[in-house]
């Protein structure tokens, strides 16, 4: 079944480039940039990938991202991910990147962007993988900081298809970022946002009504609010769900409890994605395979999930 799932044409709509930094590449970049790491070797680092919640993961994620310093580093990171896409028949990807993670460390915005977009261009020409880049604001920082990031992005507006919102969800509701999302939309950007991963259904309502998003990233807690579920079904608002991430971060205690197939059967346009695959133990095919192994996903359900991902692209073919 793994090979069949791997061969299925699919899109990935919820992937953080910084979260695809595999331990081997992390160590190679640290050596290249002469950065001391707190881990002795790759295996020690892998053992650190045990998280009780989103914040524990984020602490390690930001520590790992510190090895990304040069345009070549960002190219290598993105290219390694695109090779995974090619190997798993991900024909289209819409990855996030977090400029603030890097500009706050003194890395110029244009250096980050040049490395990523250079790789995405080569991914199209050399691998046949289409893409659209999403600039994501960090919600644990202020709206004013997000607006500065938007200002930095405007000279490069053609490089992005959308703006998004990620990082620590609890205590940082979408309403905190209404003004910057209004500005982004006025500048012609589409909008998406993480909501309803650890946060309550109210955060999803806010993302829809205040940020006017095209797609909900995560959204698994929508099932707790029947009126919200009905709206998502009626309006066919896509959800970019990340099963392995949800279990690694204890959103669900184990995969057998995951609600993605329940949502699919109720008519929700759910999709399967890997989120931060280097940290959560699998890329898109591994996420599909986990649903087959633990939830008994059928071939028909897998085809519908894959088709949903292709239908939910912001960049249309």
Swiss-Prot record:
Q: Which reaction does it catalyse?
A: adenine + H2O + H(+) = hypoxanthine + NH4(+)
Q: Any idea which GO molecular function terms this record carries?
A: adenine deaminase activity; zinc ion binding
**Which residues bear the site annotation Important for catalytic activity?**
218
Per UniProt, substrate binds at: 276
Active site, per annotation: 197
Q: Name one Pfam family in it.
A: A_deaminase
Which key words tag this protein in UniProt?
Hydrolase, Metal-binding, Nucleotide metabolism, Zinc
Note accompanying the cofactor annotation: Binds 1 zinc ion per subunit.
Record-level GO BP terms = adenine catabolic process; hypoxanthine salvage; nucleotide metabolic process
Lineage: superkingdom: Bacteria
The catalytic activity of this protein is classed by the Enzyme Commission as 3.5.4.2
Q: Which GO terms describe its cellular component?
A: cytosol
Q: Which residues bind Zn(2+)?
A: 14, 16, 194, 275
Q: Which InterPro entries match?
A: A_deaminase_dom (IPR001365), ADE (IPR028892), Ado/ade_deaminase (IPR006330), Metal_Hydrolase (IPR032466)
Annotated signal sequence is: none
Its needed co-factors are: Zn(2+)
Protein function: Catalyzes the hydrolytic deamination of adenine to hypoxanthine. Plays an important role in the purine salvage pathway and in nitrogen catabolism.
The UniProt similarity line reads:
Belongs to the metallo-dependent hydrolases superfamily. Adenosine and AMP deaminases family. Adenine deaminase type 2 subfamily.
HAMAP family registered for this protein in UniProt: Adenine_deaminase (MF_01962)
Protein name, as recorded: Adenine deaminase
């Amino acid at each position: 079944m793994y090979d069949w799932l791997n061969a299925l044409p699919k899109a990935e709509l919820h992937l953080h480039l910084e979260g695809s930094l595999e331990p081997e590449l992390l160590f190679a970049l640290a050596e290249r940039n002469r950065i001391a790491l707190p881990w002795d070797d790759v295996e020690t680092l892998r053992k650190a990938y045990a998280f009780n919640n989103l914040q524990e993961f984020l602490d390690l994620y930001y520590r790992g991202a510190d090895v990304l310093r040069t345009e070549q580093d960002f190219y290598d990171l993105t290219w390694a991910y695109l090779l995974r896409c090619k190997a798993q028949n991900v024909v289209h990807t819409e990855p996030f990147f977090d400029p603030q993670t890097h500009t706050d460390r003194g890395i110029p915005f244009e250096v980050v962007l040049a490395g990523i977009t250079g790789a995405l261009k080569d991914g199209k020409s050399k691998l046949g993988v289409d893409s659209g880049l999403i600039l994501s604001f960090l919600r644990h920082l202020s709206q004013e900081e997000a607006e500065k990031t938007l200002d930095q992005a405007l000279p490069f507006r053609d490089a992005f298809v959308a703006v998004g919102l990620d990082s620590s969800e609890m205590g940082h509701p979408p309403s905190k970022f209404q003004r910057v999302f209004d500005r982004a939309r006025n500048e012609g950007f589409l909008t998406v946002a993480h909501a309803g991963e650890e946060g309550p259904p109210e955060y999803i309502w806010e993302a829809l009504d205040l940020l006017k998003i095209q797609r909900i990233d995560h959204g698994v807690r929508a099932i707790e609010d029947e009126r919200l579920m009905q709206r998502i079904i009626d309006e066919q608002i896509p959800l970019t769900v990340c099963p392995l991430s949800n279990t690694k971060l204890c959103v669900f205690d184990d995969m057998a409890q995951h609600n993605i197939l329940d949502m699919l059967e109720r008519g929700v346009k759910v999709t399967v994605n890997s989120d931060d695959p280097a940290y959560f133990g699998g890329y898109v095919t591994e996420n599909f395979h986990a649903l087959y192994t633990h939830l008994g996903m059928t071939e028909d359900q897998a085809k519908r999930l894959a088709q949903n991902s292709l239908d939910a692209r912001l960049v249309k073919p």
